[in-house]
Amino acid sequence: MAEGWLNAKLAGKGWLAESAGVAAWGGSPASPEAVEAMREIGVDISGHSSRGLSRERMAAADYILVMTHGHRSEMVRRFPDAKDKIFLVHGFSPDGERDVMDPMGFAVEVYRRTRDEMIAALGDFLVHLAERGELSSE
Protein backbone atom coordinates (compact mmCIF):
# COMPACT_ATOMS: atom_id res chain seq x y z
CA MET A 1 0.00 0.00 0.00
CA ALA A 2 2.81 2.41 0.88
CA GLU A 3 4.64 1.73 -2.39
CA GLY A 4 1.52 2.34 -4.46
CA TRP A 5 0.60 5.57 -2.69
CA LEU A 6 4.14 6.96 -2.74
CA ASN A 7 4.63 6.20 -6.42
CA ALA A 8 1.33 7.92 -7.22
CA LYS A 9 2.46 11.02 -5.29
CA LEU A 10 6.07 10.96 -6.54
CA ALA A 11 5.31 10.49 -10.25
CA GLY A 12 7.50 12.87 -12.25
CA LYS A 13 9.52 13.98 -9.23
CA GLY A 14 12.60 11.81 -9.73
CA TRP A 15 11.77 9.17 -7.10
CA LEU A 16 10.66 5.55 -7.18
CA ALA A 17 9.30 3.70 -4.15
CA GLU A 18 9.80 -0.05 -3.89
CA SER A 19 8.53 -2.22 -1.09
CA ALA A 20 10.29 -5.30 0.19
CA GLY A 21 9.36 -7.47 3.10
CA VAL A 22 11.50 -8.43 6.05
CA ALA A 23 10.03 -11.93 5.83
CA ALA A 24 8.73 -11.87 2.23
CA TRP A 25 9.77 -14.61 -0.15
CA GLY A 26 8.73 -12.67 -3.19
CA GLY A 27 6.13 -13.23 -5.84
CA SER A 28 2.99 -13.01 -3.70
CA PRO A 29 0.22 -10.64 -4.81
CA ALA A 30 -1.19 -7.89 -2.63
CA SER A 31 -4.06 -9.12 -0.48
CA PRO A 32 -7.58 -8.49 -1.80
CA GLU A 33 -8.19 -6.25 1.23
CA ALA A 34 -5.15 -4.10 0.43
CA VAL A 35 -6.17 -3.85 -3.23
CA GLU A 36 -9.68 -2.77 -2.19
CA ALA A 37 -8.48 -0.23 0.38
CA MET A 38 -6.18 1.40 -2.16
CA ARG A 39 -8.70 1.22 -5.01
CA GLU A 40 -11.05 3.29 -2.84
CA ILE A 41 -8.58 6.19 -3.00
CA GLY A 42 -7.75 5.77 -6.68
CA VAL A 43 -4.49 3.83 -6.37
CA ASP A 44 -4.24 0.53 -8.28
CA ILE A 45 -1.98 -2.02 -6.60
CA SER A 46 -3.61 -5.06 -8.20
CA GLY A 47 -0.41 -5.85 -10.11
CA HIS A 48 1.82 -5.70 -7.04
CA SER A 49 4.07 -8.65 -6.31
CA SER A 50 6.02 -8.97 -3.05
CA ARG A 51 9.80 -8.76 -3.01
CA GLY A 52 12.32 -9.88 -0.45
CA LEU A 53 15.17 -7.76 0.84
CA SER A 54 18.60 -7.94 -0.74
CA ARG A 55 21.94 -6.22 -0.18
CA GLU A 56 21.65 -4.67 -3.64
CA ARG A 57 18.20 -3.26 -2.94
CA MET A 58 19.37 -1.88 0.42
CA ALA A 59 22.49 -0.30 -1.12
CA ALA A 60 20.49 1.37 -3.90
CA ALA A 61 17.93 2.97 -1.57
CA ASP A 62 18.18 6.57 -0.41
CA TYR A 63 15.65 6.05 2.38
CA ILE A 64 14.36 2.80 3.85
CA LEU A 65 11.04 3.23 5.63
CA VAL A 66 9.85 0.49 7.95
CA MET A 67 6.57 0.03 9.78
CA THR A 68 7.76 -1.16 13.20
CA HIS A 69 10.63 -0.86 15.64
CA GLY A 70 11.05 -4.64 15.31
CA HIS A 71 11.48 -4.35 11.54
CA ARG A 72 14.05 -1.59 12.01
CA SER A 73 16.03 -3.66 14.52
CA GLU A 74 15.98 -6.71 12.24
CA MET A 75 17.07 -4.70 9.21
CA VAL A 76 19.90 -2.97 11.09
CA ARG A 77 21.04 -6.39 12.31
CA ARG A 78 20.98 -7.85 8.80
CA PHE A 79 22.24 -4.75 6.96
CA PRO A 80 24.40 -2.72 9.38
CA ASP A 81 25.88 -0.63 6.56
CA ALA A 82 22.39 0.75 5.83
CA LYS A 83 21.51 1.70 9.42
CA ASP A 84 21.73 5.46 8.81
CA LYS A 85 19.05 5.34 6.13
CA ILE A 86 16.54 3.06 7.89
CA PHE A 87 13.68 5.04 9.45
CA LEU A 88 10.31 4.26 10.94
CA VAL A 89 7.56 5.48 8.63
CA HIS A 90 6.42 7.69 11.53
CA GLY A 91 10.00 8.93 11.98
CA PHE A 92 9.20 12.15 10.12
CA SER A 93 5.88 12.73 11.90
CA PRO A 94 5.38 15.26 14.67
CA ASP A 95 3.57 12.59 16.70
CA GLY A 96 6.76 10.61 17.12
CA GLU A 97 8.22 7.28 16.19
CA ARG A 98 5.51 4.69 16.66
CA ASP A 99 4.69 1.43 14.94
CA VAL A 100 2.16 0.95 12.16
CA MET A 101 0.11 -2.20 12.69
CA ASP A 102 0.35 -4.88 10.01
CA PRO A 103 -3.24 -5.46 8.84
CA MET A 104 -2.48 -8.87 7.27
CA GLY A 105 -5.26 -11.32 8.05
CA PHE A 106 -7.74 -8.68 9.19
CA ALA A 107 -10.86 -7.29 7.53
CA VAL A 108 -10.76 -4.50 4.96
CA GLU A 109 -11.75 -1.98 7.66
CA VAL A 110 -8.39 -2.58 9.37
CA TYR A 111 -6.62 -2.11 6.04
CA ARG A 112 -8.43 1.21 5.63
CA ARG A 113 -7.26 2.41 9.06
CA THR A 114 -3.70 1.28 8.31
CA ARG A 115 -3.85 2.95 4.88
CA ASP A 116 -4.97 6.24 6.39
CA GLU A 117 -2.30 6.10 9.10
CA MET A 118 0.41 5.31 6.53
CA ILE A 119 -0.73 8.08 4.20
CA ALA A 120 -0.52 10.64 7.01
CA ALA A 121 2.97 9.46 7.98
CA LEU A 122 4.15 9.27 4.37
CA GLY A 123 2.82 12.78 3.81
CA ASP A 124 5.13 13.93 6.61
CA PHE A 125 7.98 12.09 4.87
CA LEU A 126 7.22 13.96 1.62
CA VAL A 127 7.29 17.26 3.54
CA HIS A 128 10.73 16.23 4.83
CA LEU A 129 11.93 15.57 1.26
CA ALA A 130 10.54 18.89 0.04
CA GLU A 131 12.11 20.83 2.90
CA ARG A 132 15.49 19.28 2.07
CA GLY A 133 15.06 20.13 -1.62
CA GLU A 134 15.11 16.46 -2.57
CA LEU A 135 12.00 16.49 -4.78
CA SER A 136 12.44 17.61 -8.37
CA SER A 137 9.59 19.35 -10.14
CA GLU A 138 9.93 17.35 -13.37
Tell where the protein language model's regions lie, with residue ranges.
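Conserved active-site segments centered on acidic
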Residues: M1-A60, V127-E138
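Phosphate-binding/catalytic loops
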Residues: Y63, H69-E138
